[in-house]
Amino acid sequence: MYRNVCVIAALFCIAAAATAETYIQQDSIARNKQDYAYLVAYTEANYAAFPAIMQAGYGAPYQAMKDSFGAKIGRGEWGIKQAACEYVYWFNAHFDAHFYVDEYLFWQVYKRRDTPDYKHLMNYAPQAVSQRVNRKTWLLRVPSCAGQNPTNEWVAQAVETFLQSGCKHLIIDLRGNSGGSDMIWIPLLPLLIDHQANMPETYWFRNTYANRYSPAMQDWLLAQIANNEDPAPMFLQVGAEDDEEDEAIPAHDARIHISFIIDRKTASSAETILRVARNYTDRDRYTIYGKENSAGAAETGNLFPFHLPNSRIQVFYPTTVSSVFLRDGQQNGAAGIAPDVRIELPYPDTLTDNVDSWVLYIAKRPASPNHLKEGAQQSGQK
């Protein structure tokens, strides 16, 4: 009898444990579904580029993607971390690299699909550099736009030193620069502006309660939208459109040729200076060099974070979007800015505070209109 009771008790414990495990699993799925629903709803309501993407005709594939991922969560095939990464990467890969999940899985698995792991290809730790390369060429390496390494003051002094050097070829190295603030480029603007904008544009803030009252709201942005009374439009203009025909072109030396070096980590504010050149600089005065395109985070900005309620996964999304994005949907926006000349050399062994092999290669090339034709041919061969 005692043995039977023990056996029954043991079986009861096993059954209870199995039942508890089932309940935990079901509870986990329920929480994952809640988090996924929150991610979807928050994105649709607040992500600045979302309306443009839908208006560009991507509603059907988006709905199919959203439903498919939700079903996989419901069946227990995916956890919330994978689902969140898959959902956000759909936008990140096709439209806008500014939308991302702040998780190791996102950066080391999903972004590896389109971004080389440079630290495994070379000694990759770009540092600020301002120095002469040869008699005619100056190198300005700017690894960040965050205003710390380098500072805005350092960049201003570097530009002044270059202008005093007599060099007529400026290499602006943007490899590894994932952005920060556009303010860092102000000292360089007079060197780049040859004419009025080829394509006037402005930025628009997606005017939602969550965006307006986010703790991440910056004072300068709040000042531009604060005077709009509720109910306000879905989008509020941030700054004036850059098509002022009476705005004077700054005096500068038009003999200076500017070469940019980019990689797939060149993003956001680092892409801004490339867009300035493409919009304002005479075409024979600049060249973009690289092996890969830039990151594709050029036409949105002002990132805010939010957390999924159960898992606390953090997602960053842009609250402003360019009028260029709104005009055409930019279905290839995440492809980034393509180099004019794709560098066929191997990656350098070291990219730190040195003059690397790519810089030496560019310094020896003639800065003439012929580089554009040659660059187009090289790009087409890739």
Feature annotation, model-predicted:
Residues 16-19, 241-246, 378:
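Intrinsic low-complexity, intrinsically disordered segments enriched in polar/basic residues
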Residues 264, 268, 272-279, 300:
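C-terminal structural cap/anchor segments
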Residues 160, 246-249, 275-278:
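Mature extracellular/periplasmic domains of secretome proteins
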Residues 322-348:
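A recognition module on extended beta-rich or small alphabeta surfaces enriched in W/G with H and D/E
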Residues 215-245:
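Aspartyl protease catalytic domain
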